Amino acid sequence: MASNDSWAKTPAQPKRVGLFGLVCLVISAMLGGGVYNLPQSVAQGASAVAVLFAWIVTGLGMLCLANVFRILSIEKPELKNGIYSYAEKGFGRFMGFLVAYGYWVCNCFAMVVYAILLPSTLDLFFPGVFGDGTNWASIALSSGITWLMFVLACRGAQSTAIINAIGTIGKVVPIVLFILLMGSCFSGDFFAQHALGSQGAATLERAQFFDQVGSAMMITLFLFIGIEGAVVVSGEAVNAKAVSRATMIGFTVTLVLYVLVSIVPYGSFTQDEIGAMANPSMAALLASHFGLWGALLVNVGIVISVLSAWLVWTVMLGQMPFYAAKDRVFPQVFCKENRVGAPVPSLLATTLVVQGLIVLAHFVQGNAWQVMVNITAVMAMPCYLVCSFYLFKLALRGPWSSCVRRSTGLAFGLAATLFSCYLIYEANIELLVVACTIFVIGFPIYLWARRKEQVFTKSEACLAVIIVIAAIVGICSMVGLI
């Protein structure tokens, strides 16, 4: 009789994801449901000119970050799970654990954003059933979809890449149609007249303008989480060159779509009008010009967008504990695969965490969607910082090939490091406390994985103590004990 322990077998010839599949993965990971409310989100606090300025700053910063992942995929093609493996290679196993765990938890929260957005969108079709996306009907629907994504992800990265390619095309088409339809109503004179918002050039002060830019950047920065998508599954890619090209192509396409979606409405609506639009604002804008069918088009796009991104993140998150376990910073149980190379225990753990967070969202006070978005953003930034600094360190004094100039790697590494530091500096202090607390909750996972070996070096022990103290002091301060 054949053995049933197929999880322990590593497939000899796993199927690989090609350039098109990787590009779709990057686009789908970044182009989530947030794009459908982008016009209203940025217009609530920024004029057209401020939004353009925010996109310039964000675009340059994220271009540097995209090049960090592009160059690292070329210089270190043997590191098959980018975000984690770069941290572990550059700064030791404990830092590797922090990035692996932080990135994993961060995007578990991001998946809960999808779990809230989807039923709240469907409430337009079934009024009163799903509400704001956190009632028990919503939880039941989102839970069912979460486990369906688990089943699909267990079929392997290549199988899900095909589904994701179809989903990516399905989500991009409504966005392109929105840009074309709103572009047909665009008035250059109207745009110029209202470019600085309701205050106008006469009364707008410089400090107010940069406050508007900062407000818009809080939205634009969150939208780019997922830029590392091709790197995270680089172990499943046909080659390192495909990973590099997919990262840059996906970034460019997504940036162009984001800029056009956020700017084109200013050609026929004022800032105040766009900021007052109902969620999702893309649907409300089209409905204002073209009637109900415009809103229907966008809502269908949201459903496709969320389902596609949900699947992508399930696959990506399944890779993180798997590769971390191979380097003994996660428990060895996560090393197991099924016969098609899918890391089933890792996928199962991800699904269970997401399931728990979906239920938790029901009890969150206030806007649960915004809470999940904020936690996702603050947990992602340290991960990007570590990868950026690793490239800077590597280009400064590490081994280097002739494929990319060392000075190029040094410049992009330094620029992305400074950009990531700025993002962390701008984060809300309460969110940083939450991040430290989440890291501390994960420490037992690392202790379990390293129980038979040296757990910490001296510097790692100091870092762990600092994180614990920061979490304790922050919590005590928030509850008024100090």
Question: Where do the protein language model's features map onto the residues?
Answer:
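TM-loop-TM module centered on a large, flexible mid-protein loop between adjacent transmembrane helices
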Residues: 84-88, 92, 124-128, 203, ...
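Helix-loop-helix junctions that connect adjacent transmembrane segments
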Residues: 7-15, 52, 129-137, 169-299
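Membrane-interface "cap" regions at the ends of multi-pass membrane proteins
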Residues: 1-40, 44-45, 49-52, 62-71, ...
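Membrane-interface loop-to-helix entry segments
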Residues: 137-191, 247-251, 377-382, 408-412, ...
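Hydrophobic transmembrane alpha-helices that form the core helical bundles
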Residues: 43-44, 54, 63-146, 150-154, ...
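Loop-to-transmembrane helix boundary motifs in multi-pass membrane proteins
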Residues: 14, 18-19, 139-143, 239-240, ...
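C-terminal membrane-solvent junction of multi-pass transporters and transport-like membrane proteins
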Residues: 337-338, 384-469
